[in-house]
């Protein structure tokens, strides 16, 4: 008998740092101009679930699309490298033409 647990906890993504770099690179290639940390997090979690890169994926269905704090730090470190290499910059303020989430950070891809 299989038992499925439902969880609203942050999703424990199990990408290595190198795998996470690839996932973020793939996402940035699809971005036309700007993105939010929230949108990137959604993409990473959705992809991790599809690829089986989530702890307890076989027995847990997550209703959250937030990453764990440790995964968020890895993503932040990778984004910092993109900023340092002038491939992405932080966009301060709000954009009325995009979805805005409280305490979210927007980024612009340098083309």
Predicted regions and their residues:
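Short, cationic-aromatic polyanion-contact patches
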Residues: 93-111
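Long, low-complexity, charged/polar intrinsically disordered regions in eukaryotic proteins
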Residues: 1-37
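Surface-exposed polar/charged interaction patches
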Residues: 26, 30, 34, 47-51, ...
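Detector for intrinsically disordered, low-structure N-terminal pre-sequences
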Residues: 10, 44, 89, 107-109
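Charge-rich, solvent-exposed alpha-helical interaction surfaces
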Residues: 19, 23-27, 43, 47, ...
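A short, conserved structural fragment
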Residues: 83-93
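Short helix-coil junctions and helix-kink-helix linkers
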Residues: 42-73
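Short amphipathic alpha-helical interaction segments
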Residues: 67-85
